[in-house]
From Swiss-Prot:
Function: Mitochondrial transporter of arginine, lysine, homoarginine, methylarginine and, to a much lesser extent, ornithine and histidine. Does not transport carnitine nor acylcarnitines. Functions by both counter-exchange and uniport mechanisms. Plays a physiological role in the import of basic amino acids into mitochondria for mitochondrial protein synthesis and amino acid degradation.
Species whose genome carries this gene: Bos taurus (Bovine)
Pfam family name, one: Mito_carr
Repeat positions for Solcar: 2-86, 90-178, 185-275
Any single GO BP term: L-lysine transmembrane transport
Entry protein name: Mitochondrial basic amino acids transporter
Gene name of the encoded protein: SLC25A29
Length: 298
């Protein structure tokens, strides 16, 4: 159990390092003004950030997801595994339900973490920055808006994370069964990369419009008076001003990010588990018994 958790954390770190630049681009595209858009698309956004802020601009707000990573993985692994055992049978439906439960519970950490990440990604570079880092960002929000401000976007985060984690674990379970992912298979790692990457894409496609609303709510008021009264008002205003396409803004960068992030996550998890269990077998004097371990979840 502890080894799985450690491997999951290592995989999560790898996933964040690979995917954060894409996430920065996604957020900036989602919240930019339709009247005066700063970026023409995903590629132009990448180029503009690097030109104006250097490559480090793509990693703005990185501290927030890294800071919450250990706790989020603990919740996801623990809740998903315990829920699956409580349901009594490892079936696709139970994988969905266990994943949905894990997604809902980890919102307690995910929502404030993403709020800080979004604010840091959107602030301008330079000495006049509002926030010095994720903790300073959350501390300032708490002083100004209280606990409610720190949890801004919680409902939309729940609406996104609950079904998306369910879809993720369901897709991953179906694909690993179909691909025949078994310990000792020499193609296990490529199969896990394919299953994990595809599952990540499926989970994002299932709830992406909700993510757009969540980003807008969490960025609301950063550059002036708040515009939205809540989720429904945000949806109505966004649709009225920009049409249905607003709910797919930044989707390209998100899907570009989804596959490599999950590929990096599962490759790292597999390597860590294999090395650790190989060491265990060596210490026990039975090196031949250490099979390549398949991670149980993201």
């Amino acid at each position: 159990m502890a080894l799985d958790f450690l491997a999951g954390c290592a995989g999560g770190v790898a996933g964040v390092l690979v995917g954060h630049p894409f996430d920065t681009v996604k957020v900036r595209l989602q919240v930019q003004s339709v009247e005066k858009p700063q970026y023409r698309g995903t590629l132009h956004c990448f180029q503009a950030i690097i030109k104006q802020e250097s490559v480090l601009g793509l990693y703005r707000g990185l501290g927030s997801p890294l800071l919450g990573l250990t706790f989020i993985n603990a919740l996801v692994f623990g809740v998903q595994g315990n829920t699956l055992r409580a349901l009594g049978r490892d079936s696709p439906l139970n994988q969905f339900l266990a994943g949905a439960a894990a997604g809902a519970i980890q919102c307690v950490i995910c929502c404030p973490m993403e709020l800080a990440k979004t604010r840091l990604q959107l602030q301008e570079a330079g000495p006049a920055r509002t926030y010095r880092g994720p903790l300073d960002c959350l501390a300032q929000i708490y002083r100004q808006e209280g606990l409610r401000g720190v949890n801004r976007g919680m409902v939309s985060t729940l609406l996104r994370e609950t079904p998306s984690f369910g879809v993720y674990f369901l897709t991953y379970d179906v694909l690993t069964r179909a691909l025949g992912c078994e310990p000792g298979d020499r193609l296990l790692v490529p199969k896990l990369l394919l299953a994990g990457g595809t599952s990540g894409i499926a989970s994002w496609l299932s709830t992406y419009p909700v993510d757009v609303v969540k980003s807008r709510l969490q960025a609301d008021g950063l550059q002036g008076a708040p515009r939205y009264r809540g989720i429904v008002d945000c949806v109505q205003q966004s649709y009225r001003e920009e049409g249905w396409r607003v709910f797919t803004r930044g989707l390209a960068s998100t899907l570009l990010r989804a596959f490599p992030v999950n590929a990096a996550t599962f490759a790292t998890v597999t390597v860590v588990l294999s090395y650790a269990r190989g060491e265990e077998a060596r210490l026990e004097g039975d090196a031949g018994s250490a099979a390549l371990a398949q991670p149980s979840s993201l």
